[in-house]
């Protein structure tokens, strides 16, 4: 639109435009060689319904699944059902590995909406339930819209070693009468 073009925003032109994401398949690094896609889950709406029985349909070891291609899983010694650490410079989470050819090599999927459950483990804060927002950027879609784009990031995935922390997000509060 001429009105939007008149704002002269470099990241929001007056016509439909594609902008290369700041993190994605084409910007991988040695430390973060996998592109994370934080897609919406079919079992909830954002984080709504995560505390209901619907989470049992997909979760692995009570954690959000991490879909990973067989080639990437084999390189990392990961099998379906393993608990994995998904990490980058912004954060880390634990997820249940789901090895599938439904994602292409170099890409992993951790669905959006798991309830946040941070714990300090060996001097590092790790979300033990699989909240993908711990890994994504907090930047707006454009100078005009300022919407949320928290759907991609660069990550590394490794098999979790050590004691598996308990997921506590579904615990009911103590009742005081």
Regions inferred by a protein language model and the residue ranges of each:
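Long, contiguous, secondary-structure-rich segments that constitute the structural scaffold
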Residues: 47, 53-67, 71-177
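Long, low-complexity segments enriched in small/aliphatic residues
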Residues: 1-53
């Amino acid at each position: 639109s001429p009105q939007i073009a008149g704002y002269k925003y470099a990241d929001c032109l007056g016509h439909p435009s594609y902008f290369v994401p700041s993190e994605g398949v084409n910007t991988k690094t040695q430390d973060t060689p996998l592109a994370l896609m934080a897609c919406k889950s079919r079992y909830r709406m954002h984080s709504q319904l995560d505390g209901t029985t619907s989470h049992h349909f997909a979760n692995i070891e009570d954690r959000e699944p991490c879909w990973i291609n067989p080639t990437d899983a084999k390189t990392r010694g990961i099998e379906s059902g393993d608990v994995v650490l998904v990490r980058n410079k912004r954060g880390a989470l634990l997820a249940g590995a789901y090895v599938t050819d439904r994602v292409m090599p170099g890409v992993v999927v951790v669905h959006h909406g798991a309830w946040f459950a941070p714990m300090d483990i060996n001097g590092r804060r790790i979300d033990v339930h699989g909240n993908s927002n711990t890994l994504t950027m907090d930047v707006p879609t454009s100078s005009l819209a300022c919407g949320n784009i928290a759907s991609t990031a660069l990550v590394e995935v490794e098999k979790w070693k050590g004691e598996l922390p308990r997921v506590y997000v579904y615990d009911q509060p103590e009742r005081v009468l």
